[in-house]
Amino acid sequence: MTREEMIQAIKEMSVLELNELVKACEEEFGVSAAAPVAVAGVAGAVGAAEEKSEFDVVLANAGSQKIKVIKAVRELTGLGLKEAKEIVDGAPKTLKEGVAKEAAEEMKAKLEEVGATIELK
């Protein structure tokens, strides 16, 4: 049986048949199909970093077009003119906390479009 024939035979197996094959190989060769602990720990840490779902949107710098940034801040946060101006003038300031990833990315894009520098934390 060639390597390609073996791979094709494995592709045609059901999940139960594959499970039985793995167990038979473990018994026959005295090995384990389980991943080493060190590798599993690293994979878990990477997964945890990627799973962050809430972000703080921070205005790091208003840039040169402060009026446009103030308008964008008002639109995105619902703040009044005075409050939005205070945030923009006092940068770096947190605009919103605990924002979903998609909403945070949208806010960042809109504010960067008008010249602001935004950080997601």
UniProtKB/Swiss-Prot annotation:
| Keyword annotations of the record | Ribonucleoprotein, Ribosomal protein
Q: Which Pfam families match?
A: Ribosomal_L12, Ribosomal_L12_N
GO cellular component annotations of the record: cytosolic large ribosomal subunit
What InterPro entries does the record point to?
Ribosomal_bL12, Ribosomal_bL12_C, Ribosomal_bL12_C/ClpS-like, Ribosomal_bL12_oligo, Ribosomal_bL12_oligo_N_sf
Q: Which residues form a coiled coil?
A: none
Task: Give an example GO biological process.
Answer: translation
Gene Ontology MF terms in the entry = mRNA binding; structural constituent of ribosome
Top-level lineage group: Bacteria
Subunit comment: Homodimer. Part of the ribosomal stalk of the 50S ribosomal subunit. Forms a multimeric L10(L12)X complex, where L10 forms an elongated spine to which 2 to 4 L12 dimers bind in a sequential fashion. Binds GTP-bound translation factors.
Q: What does this protein's UniProt record list under function?
A: Forms part of the ribosomal stalk which helps the ribosome interact with GTP-bound translation factors. Is thus essential for accurate translation.
Family, according to the entry, reads as follows: Belongs to the bacterial ribosomal protein bL12 family.
User: Can you name this protein?
Assistant: Large ribosomal subunit protein bL12
Organism source for this protein? Clostridium novyi (strain NT)
